Each structure stands twice: as C-alpha cells, then as structure tokens.
C-alpha cells in the first residue's frame, strides 16, 4: 500500500517545546520569551497541501485562516512559531540553488507513483498560487504570526532524507544537486532509512551548498526573530563512527551561519537568534558530529532544543543534558515529535500531556 506524502512527512512536526531552564535569556527579542517559550515547529506540508481547508491548492487567505488557530488569539499558549523551510528535498521557497516543492519542470520530470504525483503537483500549484499573490508559505505564515505578537523563526532541516531513494523512480522529487552528485552521498546504509543516499558533510561542496541555502533564506526573510538549524531531520551527517573526528566541519558551518546572522542583525537593527535542534545527550550529539558545547563556548547559539526523531519520548534526559552541557545561561528545550504510528494516528491530548 502506498503511503501518502502526508503520512511520510508527518504533516506537522510539533515541537511542543516546554521550557526546561528558566535561566536568563537576555538575548531574546521578546519579553515573554525571556521567561519561557512554547514553540510550535511546523513542517509546512499541512499548509501547502491545504489539509485544513479541503486539500485544494492553497491561497494566501487559507494561510491567514490557518494561522489564526496557531496563535494566542486561537487560544493557544504558543509563544514562538517556527516554519520549516524544508531541505534539499521538499524545498518550500523559490531558490536559485534548487527547485521548489512540486516543481516538476512543467511535467517533464517523471513520477513512478501516481499518489506522489498528485500530491507533488498539488504542492507545486500551491507554491505558484502564493507566488502570484506576492508571497510564499514562509512569508505568509511568519508575517501573520508577527501580527499576533509571536516570536518567529525559520527551521531548516540540515539533511532531510524524505525521497532520498533513487530506486523509487520519482525523479520529480529528487533535488538536482543531490541527484547529479552521488559521489557526495555517505553510501553507508547502517544508519537507517535512506542513510546510504544521505549527503556526506565531509565534502566541502555539500557544506557550501547547505550554507548557500541558509544564507539565501536569512537574507530573504527580514521578519524573522531567529533561525534554527534542525540537525534531527535527519541525524545523518557522516559515515558511522566519523562524527567526533569531523565535528569541527559542522562547527565551522555553525560559525559561518552565526557570522551571517550577526551581519544581518546589524543591518536590521535587532538581534537575530540562532537555535539548534540536536540529540538528547551531549555525548550522542558529538558522536554524530555536533559539538554543542563548543558552539556554546564560542557564543554561537542562543538556545538548544533536544529530542528524538519521529517519536514521543517520555524520558528525555533533560537534567543530564543540562549538566553535561554546562551552559546554564543558554535555555534548553525538550521536544515532542508528532510521529510514531503507521497507518497515521495522531497522539491524543492525554498522550501529549503525558509526554510533557
């Protein structure tokens, strides 16, 4: 049985992020977020596929209506709204570095799966509708969030592996840079789903490609209060066992991103925050190439979110992470992911409360 795109993506990544540390957060751009944050991290597919309003190609009015439910006016306690920008796969904004979600070059790129074709073309028409109205899903969502007094972030998936499978035959879903450069893949299948065709960040070309996408977004969206590097989608950066040795390569990427952010902060006259999403232990993070302590030592990051991939974990070791991290001045948040069941079954309110 084919899984729909919505099932594969999980619709919304709900980082129902509960404050773990109430230590000072003077770098925050909003008074409320100095005390705590409740973050909604949305993966964007429910908006672009218009799951809220009948599944027809989306228009800006749909995004405006959709956003009401996400805001304090919609009776939520969410302080911070993050909109995912995608990754190489399922990239939402129009970009000079790749095709946007649903761009099959006017139907010239093949699909092997009719269900994927239908959803991909729906997403593409939604992108074009929004473009014709002078906006896109990121701009429309975050501007609306700002209108309601929310802190706004873009969340970028550092190495998303949805559709990273050439055997599927769905060429329309393959990013050109990824498809044309298999020499930049890990070719290591030991790390789970599609990991063998994941980008290997050992290659400077891969790192530069990612930095180009990040810088493009930072320059394009001037309404943001911050930017998140989501290393958990997916947590494959190097071949198995190479993370600790090659962690300085990722640190340099974080450093360059911070430099771009600081330059833009000076131009725009307000501080733009840099956040990261990483595994639930400091040791586990560096095993994957993520030296979170070094980033904090250098003053590169403003807050950290920890979590697992695609699971609702009731036992995230927040206190141990805080102890091992050693930076009490930097807030640490725990996340609740929206995934876990196939066929698709959402967690109940009680389950969310239990995980929290």
Language model features with spans:
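Hydrophobic faces of well-ordered beta-strands that scaffold small-molecule active sites
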Residues: 38-42, 79-83, 152-154, 227-229, ...
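Active-site neighborhood of glycoside hydrolase catalytic domains
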Residues: 205-330
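Bacterial Sec-dependent signal peptides at the C-terminal "C-region" and cleavage site
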Residues: 13-32
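Acidic-and-aromatic substrate-binding clefts and catalytic sites of carbohydrate-active enzymes
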Residues: 48, 56-58, 86-91, 131, ...
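Active-site clefts of carbohydrate-active enzymes
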Residues: 42-43, 272-280, 326-353
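Active-site-adjacent "subsite" loops/lids of carbohydrate-active enzymes
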Residues: 33-61, 109-143, 153-216, 344-355
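Catalytic domains of carbohydrate-active enzymes, especially glycoside hydrolases
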Residues: 62-90, 220-226, 300-304
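Aromatic-lined carbohydrate-binding/catalytic grooves of carbohydrate-active enzymes
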Residues: 78-131, 306-308, 315-320
């Amino acid at each position: 049985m084919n899984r729909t795109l919505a099932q594969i993506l999980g619709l919304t990544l709900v980082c129902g992020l509960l404050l773990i540390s109430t230590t000072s957060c003077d770098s925050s751009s909003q008074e409320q977020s100095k005390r705590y944050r409740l973050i909604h991290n949305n993966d964007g597919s429910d908006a672009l596929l218009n799951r809220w309003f009948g599944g027809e190609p989306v228009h800006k009015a749909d995004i405006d209506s959709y956003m009401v439910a996400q805001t304090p006016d919609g009776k939520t306690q969410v302080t911070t709204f993050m909109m995912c920008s995608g990754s190489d796969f399922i990239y939402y904004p129009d970009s000079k570095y790749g095709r946007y979600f649903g761009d099959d070059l006017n139907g010239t790129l093949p699909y092997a799966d009719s269900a994927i074709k239908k959803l991909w073309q729906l997403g593409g028409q939604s992108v074009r509708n929004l473009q014709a109205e002078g906006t896109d899903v990121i701009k429309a969502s975050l501007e609306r969030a700002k209108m309601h007094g929310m802190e706004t972030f873009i969340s970028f998936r550092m190495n998303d592996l949805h559709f990273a499978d050439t055997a599927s035959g769905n060429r329309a879903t393959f990013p050109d840079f990824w498809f044309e450069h298999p020499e930049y893949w890990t070719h290591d299948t030991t790390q789970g789903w599609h990991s063998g065709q994941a980008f290997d960040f050992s290659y400077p070309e891969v790192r530069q490609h990612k930095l180009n996408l990040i810088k493009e977004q930072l320059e394009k969206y001037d309404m943001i209060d911050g930017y998140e590097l989501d290393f958990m989608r997916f947590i494959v950066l190097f071949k198995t066992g190479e993370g600790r040795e090659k962690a300085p390569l990722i640190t340099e990427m974080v450093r360059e991103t911070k430099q771009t952010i600081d330059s833009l902060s000076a131009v725009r006259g307000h501080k733009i925050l840099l956040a990261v999403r990483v595994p639930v232990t400091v040791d586990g993070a560096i095993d994957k190439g993520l030296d979170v302590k070094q980033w904090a030592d250098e003053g590169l990051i403003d807050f950290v979110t920890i979590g697992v991939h695609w699971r609702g974990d009731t036992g995230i070791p927040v206190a141990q992470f805080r102890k091992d991290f050693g930076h009490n001045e930097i807030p640490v948040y725990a996340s609740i992911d929206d995934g876990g069941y196939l066929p698709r079954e959402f967690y109940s309110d009680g389950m969310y409360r239990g995980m929290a």
